[in-house]
Amino acid sequence: MSAELIAVYKDEQIIDLESAKVLGLSDGIKALNGTEPIYFDDSPLALEVIRHSCAHLLAQSLKALYPDAKFFVGPVVEEGFYYDFKTSSKISEEDLPKIEAKMKEFAKLKLAITKETLTREQALERFKGDELKHAVMSKIGGDAFGVYQQGEFEDLCKGPHLPNTRFLNHFKLTKLAGAYLGGDENNEMLIRIYGIAFATKEGLKDYLFQIEEAKKRDHRKLGVELGLFSFDDEIGAGLPLWLPKGARLRKRIEDLLSQALLLRGYEPVKGPEILKSDVWKISGHYDNYKENMYFTTIDEQEYGIKPMNCVGHIKVYQSALHSYRDLPLRFYEYGVVHRHEKSGVLHGLLRVREFTQDDAHIFCSFEQIQSEVSAILDFTHKIMQAFDFSYEMELSTRPAKSIGDDKVWEKATNALKEALKEHRIDYKIDEGGGAFYGPKIDIKITDALKRKWQCGTIQVDMNLPERFKLAFTNEYNHAEQPVMIHRAILGSFERFIAILSEHFGGNFPFFVAPTQIALIPINEEHHVFALKLKEALKKRDIFVEVLDKNDSLNKKVRLAEKQKIPMILVLGNEEVETEILSIRDREKQDQYKMPLKEFLNMVESKMQEVSF
């Protein structure tokens, strides 16, 4: 079965076999007329077809178990697939095994999956009395609607689908949740069931292993266990409290970044947390982003709490006159921003209402875009390398609705392409995915569990300089408008630390670990030596703790191991008398001895190994 053709690919579109036969693109065995074959395997294109059909298998099984069920949409998403539906029956996660069993029954029946095309009038009649299907059709233009059938079940769908349910053997329903109809909280709440599907048993097994591993690495769980951060209902949802260990971790990253930014010619700046609404009207945020902002009134004047740092940096630029000799100007700020997120989407540190961006804005001429972006790409590589992240880039180009001259857009986009080419970076292109005011590069990192995360962005902006009438004097003594480059490499410290925690499973590398060394005196007479060693390490900028509670030695060692501290030193008579230290090194997975002076030199050099 692994070599069977299940679909073809042409012009960036997956076409299922039934449709491909009609179009002369396949004879059912091989791809024809320049199309790319899609075989039954765990490749991305094949999985899209497999998971789409598994969503229909889920709906078919739900209809069999709950006859009054009505279905909205069942798309393929990054984490598998889901189906939104409603029924008068109460369904909980405890029902998922029963639903899954019914899915396996239908799969074993080897039902042919066929397609029929109806006019709008025919489709409305076919699904008469089904308000959810009518809601789907109301969002679709044209007069052709696909309906896929398998056994007695049929559903409105554009495809693509497998030719038969016999292909669906390796799937798992993963969770149940609520979802508003069409994502609008003013509409009724539907039930959403998520699932995953693969072509092979190995694919499913590996995925389920990753899910279990992800649960162990969940940053919300690690945040509590390692004492990094917390949330408090009395303070409010989405507003994290950084505990001492988490703040130490964060400060280390901030300090490393600041050192690198200063060396790279960035100037630190700081804008206010609240700004008059007048400037948000000039920037366009008031008209286009108001629902995500918080407002207050002071002396009968409306102010907006900043959701972004760009306006403050523009005002820094406007605080002085500039000539072409001043450019590029690079301003950076660890800017605290607030955005109104719905409570349902808040998720640990990954999605919060207050967060701090590693934000920078570069004001430069058009001719400097490529060199500035190239420098940002170099900086990005060094940061990702330090944290052992692989990453990819995606270039988003001009959308249909945009401002600016075609030649200006082309010039800006080519500058980004040339910068990527200069660094030999393979990148994807998201045609039309740019902002209305300029092209951008998105930085997507891959963690240890092979999950992709959107973090940083490099955004060329030709809009805000125009709105705020920014200018510099060029070499011909004429006023010229600068280009503004928004850039954040980590995205936000909150989000990045959440990803970092899960990437390392809490086993942070030595250079950023919130506690780098644990000192464990065996008894009271060794305590003075431990404190002396602690001071020597602190002078070398090492985060160190003395575990001196009245517990057994084994218990103190276990505590240090649970806290995932990179180095543990047990201090007894021998260590105090000889000053030869016994070291448990997590990174080396080894225990060894080292003279005190040599150890101090070693940890000092370890702190110098990493720079951005």
Curated annotation (Swiss-Prot):
Superkingdom per UniProt: Bacteria
Cofactor note as given: Binds 1 zinc ion per subunit.
UniProt keyword terms in alphabetical order: Aminoacyl-tRNA synthetase, ATP-binding, Cytoplasm, Ligase, Metal-binding, Nucleotide-binding, Protein biosynthesis, RNA-binding, tRNA-binding, Zinc
Binding positions (Zn(2+)): C310, H361, H486
Organism: Helicobacter pylori (strain ATCC 700392 / 26695)
Gene Ontology molecular-function annotations: ATP binding; metal ion binding; threonine-tRNA ligase activity; tRNA binding
Subunit details: Homodimer.
Subcellular localization, as worded in the UniProt entry: Cytoplasm
Entry protein name: Threonine--tRNA ligase
Physiological role: Catalyzes the attachment of threonine to tRNA(Thr) in a two-step reaction: L-threonine is first activated by ATP to form Thr-AMP and then transferred to the acceptor end of tRNA(Thr). Also edits incorrectly charged L-seryl-tRNA(Thr).
Catalysed transformations (reactions): tRNA(Thr) + L-threonine + ATP = L-threonyl-tRNA(Thr) + AMP + diphosphate + H(+)
Presence of keyword Oxidoreductase: no
Database matches in InterPro entries: aa-tRNA-synt_IIb (IPR002314), aa-tRNA-synth_II (IPR006195), aa-tRNA-synth_II/BPL/LPL (IPR045864), Anticodon-bd (IPR004154), Anticodon-bd_dom_sf (IPR036621), Thr-tRNA-ligase_IIa (IPR002320), Thr/Ala-tRNA-synth_IIc_edit (IPR018163), ThrRS_anticodon (IPR047246)
Required cofactor(s): Zn(2+)
Biological processes per GO annotation: threonyl-tRNA aminoacylation
Pfam families (alphabetical): HGTP_anticodon (PF03129), tRNA-synt_2b (PF00587), tRNA_SAD (PF07973)
Main enzyme class: ligase
Region (Catalytic): 218-509
